[in-house]
Amino acid sequence: RTGASVFVHSIKNQLLANRILEKRISQELDKPEPDLSRVRACVKQLQESNEMLISRSEELYRTAKNKSVTLVPTTLGQIRETTLERFRRKYPDALLECRLNESETVLADGNYLSEALYNLLTNAWEANVDAGHGDRPIRLSSSRERLYVVLEVRDEGCGMTKAEQKKIFEPFYSSKNSNTSWGMGLYHVRTIVRAHVGSLRVESKPGRGTSFFVLLPKYVQDR
C-alpha cells in the first residue's frame, strides 16, 4: 500500500495498541495485589510506543516542510564526521567500512546532507540484520563520475526487485511493517539530495544486496 492511507492506518494501529496497554495497566492496578512487574512492563511498552509516534511525526514534519538549504564548500571529511557521530549513537556496534576521499569538496548543507546519509546507513544496517548478515559490514565510499562526486552506501541485505525499486522513493511507501515504519525515509533523502542539485539512484538485485548512489556536483573553486 502507498499514500496517506498507510500513514493513517499506522497511527490508528499504534493508538489502538496504546489503548490496550492502558487497559492492562488499569486492570492490574485494580487487583487487590497488583503485579507491579507487569505494570512496569506495560508502562515501558507504552513509553516506547509514544516515543516512536513522536519520532515518526517529527520525521514526517521534516519531510513535509519546505527545505531551505545553505550550500557552502564542505569536505567529505566534515560530512563523514557528522554522519557517523549520529549513526554510532543509534548503532554503536554496527560494522561499517568507510572509504571516503575526505579532502574532496562539494557544495553542501552539512546538516541536511549528513541527515540523508544517516538515513541511508541506517537502512543499510537494518537490511543486513534483517537478512541475517549482521556479521557483515555495510560500506560508505566515494568516487568520481564525470562532473559529479558519488557517495555510495552499500548493504548485504536481501535486495529488491525492479518493481520495488520503482516504488521506494514514493512518500509513505515501505516494505517494512507499516506500524513501525511510515515509509518517509527514502523520500526524505531524495528531497535533500535534489535540494543539493544532485540525484539519487539505486542498484539492487534480490539476494544480492543494495547500493544507493548520491551524485553531487563537484565543487570547482574559481581561480
Which sequence ranges carry the predicted segments?
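Conserved HAMP-HisKA connector
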Residues: 1-10
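Detector for a conserved hydrophobic position within an alpha-helical segment of the HATPase_c
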Residues: 193-194
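Conserved catalytic submotifs in the C-terminal HATPase_c
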Residues: 95-105
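Short alpha-helical Gxxx[C/S/T] motif in the catalytic ATP-binding
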Residues: 185-189
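Acidic ATP/Mg2+-coordinating residue in the GHKL
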Residues: 155
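Short conserved segment of the HATPase_c
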Residues: 160-172
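Conserved DHp (HisKA) dimerization/phosphotransfer helix of two-component histidine kinases, i.e.
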Residues: 17-93
